[in-house]
Amino acid sequence: MIEKTVNINNFIGTYDNYITKEECNKAIKLYENQNKFNNTVNRMGMEKASILQKQDQQFFANGNNIDVWWEDLKSMMVNLDLAFNHYIDNTGAKEAYGVPFHFTTLKIQKTLPTEGYHVWHI
């Protein structure tokens, strides 16, 4: 088993190995399948953004389409929740906001070379 490591510096948290390669591949496959069915959006159309600023393509996973994504992303969401709860407990975010946090929507974003600095963004 690969060791999970955490580094928080100036409120930027790096959680290595919390999301496995297998979980990443499931998210990518889900995105690609949803893109084939035209269930993704781009920010040029959605936000009326200039092609020079935003060109990425996104899939939004939420309660309205949980039947599409939950089984594929369940283990990733558990690990994301572990990392997120560690972060809010160790940065003062829980006290700063004063209300419980809830996941409402997961965005899987594909950004190609020259479109930004991420290849994949969750």
Predicted regions and their residues:
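Non-heme Fe(II)/2-oxoglutarate
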Residues: 2-100
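Acidic, glycine-rich loop-and-strand cores that form catalytic or ligand-binding grooves
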Residues: 97-112
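Conserved short histidine dyad/triad with adjacent acidic residue
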Residues: 108-122
